[in-house]
């Protein structure tokens, strides 16, 4: 077993060796390096064929038509293109958008930008388990609502939203439905032939593909129109100009192909490992799981260890790579806005650790992690005056702290 142990697969994944090998065939002069938009020679034709094959693999995994896949630089761009593109195209119908407070920043900040442009956004509060109240969503819908954007799986707490039910509500009101599926594609079965989803964002690097490439599913039936953000040569049916990075697209396609083959056996394996981790940690006193355990991705565990400061716990756990909050915002010392939206107080939100498991996680690594966390929590609580007060039965909420 090698240290440090990587348990931050929701932040990114290593590129699968099979994917890297495939990508190498599309880079050098010995390989297939052509521009897929070059229609006048073999180099271009071969590159175009490689892109088509990859596009089919991606469509196959999610039950879509390959013509519905638009390549982007990643899920952040896909979120931007979906939300801004739809808002700008359909603004004559209305300027109201609905999303949730626990969405990824790529969705929330895009909505904030649209607010600056005169759109109105309703931010739904999740329930304490992280799930959305469908009645609340229904009540938030108005005649001028043009778009609902709700993620499939939350990146911090792994909670799975009922996108089938949300899709039905949206379709009944003729409102476009965008799903950020960055954390769910390849980990949960998704069939867009059945789901009433109009737009769906996807990433490659959360699925053992390369960084810097992603895709947006844009429904053809019913047809969804978008206003482009990036203009140029009119690539990707005019929705996203720019020379296609063939090696990255091939990598993403191969990663999605592998996931389709291995998902049925891989997810139960990860669930067993995640449950082993949970069972090893749940008996630590004052430990709380954040988000629904029932409606949750099999590879995610987000736990708060009360009376332990999150950053010091991260330092004590330097032999394992975990995170507090998402990678995109973990550089700030603010407590996770996702956990705050669930109603956690600052202390509990600050003491949360996200463990996310993946393809290379082993049983040995999980057992090592359990022991390490147990010892670290015990050690840090020994140093904590708050823990002593709690053990003495003092209600910390009744104490008035002096502010310096």
From Swiss-Prot:
Active site residues according to the UniProt entry: 328 (cysteine persulfide intermediate)
Keyword entries, A-Z: 2Fe-2S, Cytoplasm, Iron, Iron-sulfur, Metal-binding, Pyridoxal phosphate, Transferase
Cofactor: pyridoxal 5'-phosphate
InterPro entries: Aminotrans_V_dom, Aminotrans_V_PyrdxlP_BS, Cys_deSase_IscS, Cysteine_dSase, PyrdxlP-dep_Trfase, PyrdxlP-dep_Trfase_major, PyrdxlP-dep_Trfase_small
Pathway in which the depicted protein is active: Cofactor biosynthesis; iron-sulfur cluster biosynthesis
GO cellular component: L-cysteine desulfurase complex
One record GO biological process: [2Fe-2S] cluster assembly
EC number, as in UniProt: 2.8.1.7
Regions crossing the membrane: none
GO MF: 2 iron, 2 sulfur cluster binding; cysteine desulfurase activity; metal ion binding; pyridoxal phosphate binding
Location of this chain's protein in the cell: Cytoplasm
Residues bearing PTM N6-(pyridoxal phosphate)lysine: 206
Residues that, per the record, bind [2Fe-2S] cluster: 328
Reactions catalysed, as given in the entry: (sulfur carrier)-H + L-cysteine = (sulfur carrier)-SH + L-alanine
Domain of life the protein comes from: Bacteria
Summary of subunit composition and partner proteins: Homodimer. Forms a heterotetramer with IscU, interacts with other sulfur acceptors.
NCBIfam families per record: IscS, PRK02948.1, PRK14012.1
Function comment: Master enzyme that delivers sulfur to a number of partners involved in Fe-S cluster assembly, tRNA modification or cofactor biosynthesis. Catalyzes the removal of elemental sulfur atoms from cysteine to produce alanine. Functions as a sulfur delivery protein for Fe-S cluster synthesis onto IscU, an Fe-S scaffold assembly protein, as well as other S acceptor proteins.
Family note: Belongs to the class-V pyridoxal-phosphate-dependent aminotransferase family. NifS/IscS subfamily.
UniProt protein name: Cysteine desulfurase IscS
Source organism per UniProt: Pasteurella multocida (strain Pm70)
Gene symbol of the encoding locus: iscS
